[in-house]
């Protein structure tokens, strides 16, 4: 929760000349849940955000400027897969809603408007295979190897021994505590007990405990995955955007999008070894969207747009130790929008659609290098290319981004070819103390 308040004024012996008040407050709540068993994989995510602000400025006791705003948003999503041996049925609903309202008074004018958004998707999957999180197994190997290197653990432990240690780590991480310090103390005590009871430890001293604490604190990230999963999906969705402007012409816009996709999705994740990870995904679907935009008194447009989408993304990660990583990625997304003729029986002049082709491709990397406790390097580089071609008869249209899970619309799309873009960032951190 964040709150801020600022008050300042300028005055003379004759009274206040100016006065400004500013107050803002925000509340953010986030919840996540992960479950993995032989029969059931589940992830839950929920977030709530509420905020507001008030800003006033007065001169000689008269209000010159006042701005007040209120915003809120709720996001809910769930990933569920129920397994029958290697086959599964999945249901992954999501819901997002937001509201923003503002009241602006300045120099004799009064401006009010509000914007609300709501979207939901309810995809259903049927597929084969599963992908598991394996960072606990990697952390078990980190702990054991670090203790062997410090001559505090016995060499020769088998892969089965390390898998049993990984299972213990998973159990400890799922224990719930209100106080994070008590949780960490409990985890280290239980881990120390397990290592001694199962013959891992030769000697326990300050070096042993410092190494164990370090690997427990920093050896659990980033997330690592392993497995293959293929699925066919059916994904209906609905999105509504509404804007009301109470100033001037008192405008009103209501945009509704009805979405439907069906296709296939392939995911592959492979930890090549302790240090290398490869992740590959492929998606192809056919979808149709309908966009109806209403003004206060009339229908402004009614677009019906079928389309085909194909996308491939590959990422390779290199993790030489617990504090350094390098990740390289590349992707290609292709989309084709196909014109659907207007219903000849319709008397609605606003019904239409469009033709177009789109290409998005890019490659890049990001990395974090830990030289020492005092010096760290963080950087990223990306190069991107895009090309869009629209039938000349359909230039001023609503268009969707081909690389999104839903259809993201923006207006005024025109032809664009051979557009290159790049992104580069580099930062060096040096700590004096």
Region spans (language model):
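Transmembrane beta-strands of outer-membrane beta-barrel proteins
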Residues: 1, 40-48, 87-95, 120-122, ...
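Short glycine/proline- and aromatic-enriched beta-strand/turn motifs that initiate or cap beta-hairpins
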Residues: 1-35, 39, 231-252, 399, ...
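Transmembrane beta-strands of outer-membrane beta-barrel pores
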Residues: 3-9, 33, 48-58, 70, ...
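Residues that define the transmembrane beta-barrel architecture of outer-membrane proteins
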Residues: 17-27, 64-74, 114-124, 256-262, ...
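Outer-membrane beta-barrel architecture
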Residues: 28-32, 75-79, 125, 263-269, ...
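Repeated loop/turn-to-beta-strand initiation elements of outer-membrane beta-barrel proteins
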Residues: 34-44, 81-89, 130-137, 272-278, ...
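Outer-membrane beta-barrel "beta-signal"
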Residues: 119-137, 416-433
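Outer membrane beta-barrel transmembrane domains
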Residues: 242-254, 285-433
């Amino acid at each position: 929760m964040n709150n801020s308040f600022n008050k300042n004024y300028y005055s003379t012996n004759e009274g206040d000349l100016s006065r400004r008040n500013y107050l803002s407050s925000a509340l953010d709540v986030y919840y996540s849940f992960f479950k993995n068993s032989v029969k059931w994989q589940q992830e839950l995510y929920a977030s709530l955000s509420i905020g507001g602000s008030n800003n006033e400025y007065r001169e000689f006791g008269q209000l010159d400027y006042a701005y007040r705003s209120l915003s809120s948003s709720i996001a809910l999503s769930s990933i569920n897969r129920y397994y029958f041996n290697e086959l599964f049925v999945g249901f992954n609903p999501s819901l997002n809603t937001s509201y923003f309202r503002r009241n602006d008074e300045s120099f004799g004018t009064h401006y009010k408007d509000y914007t609300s958004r709501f979207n939901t998707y309810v995809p259903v999957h049927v597929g084969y295979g599963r992908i598991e999180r394996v960072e606990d197994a990697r952390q078990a190997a980190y702990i054991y190897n670090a203790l062997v290197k410090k001559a505090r653990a016995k060499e020769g432990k088998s892969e089965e021994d390390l898998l049993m240690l990984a299972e213990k780590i998973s159990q400890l991480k799922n224990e719930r505590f209100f106080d994070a310090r008590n949780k960490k103390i409990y985890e280290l005590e239980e881990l120390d007990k397990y290592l001694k009871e199962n013959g891992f430890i030769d000697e326990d001293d300050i070096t042993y405990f410092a190494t164990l604490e370090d690997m427990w604190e920093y050896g659990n990230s980033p997330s690592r995955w392993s497995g293959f999963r293929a699925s066919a999906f059916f994904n209906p969705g609905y999105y509504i955007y509404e804007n009301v402007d109470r100033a001037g012409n008192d405008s009103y816009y209501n945009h509704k999008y009805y979405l439907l996709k069906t296709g296939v999705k392939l995911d592959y994740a492979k930890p090549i070894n302790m240090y290398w990870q490869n992740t590959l995904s492929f998606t192809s679907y056919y979808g149709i969207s309908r966009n109806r935009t209403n003004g206060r008194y009339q229908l402004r447009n009614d677009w019906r747009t079928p389309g085909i989408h194909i996308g491939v993304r590959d990422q390779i990660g290199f993790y030489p130790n617990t504090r350094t990583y390098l990740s390289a990625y590349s992707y290609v997304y292709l989309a084709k929008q196909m014109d659907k003729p207007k219903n000849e029986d319709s008397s609605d002049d606003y019904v239409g659609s469009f033709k177009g082709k789109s290409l998005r491709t890019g490659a890049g990397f990001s990395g974090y290098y830990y030289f020492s406790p005092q010096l760290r390097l963080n950087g990223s580089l990306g190069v991107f290319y895009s090309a869009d071609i629209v039938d000349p008869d359909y230039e001023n249209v609503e268009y969707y981004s081909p690389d999104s899970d839903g259809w993201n619309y923006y207006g005024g799309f025109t032809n664009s070819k051979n557009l290159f873009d790049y992104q580069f960032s580099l930062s060096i951190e040096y700590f004096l103390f």
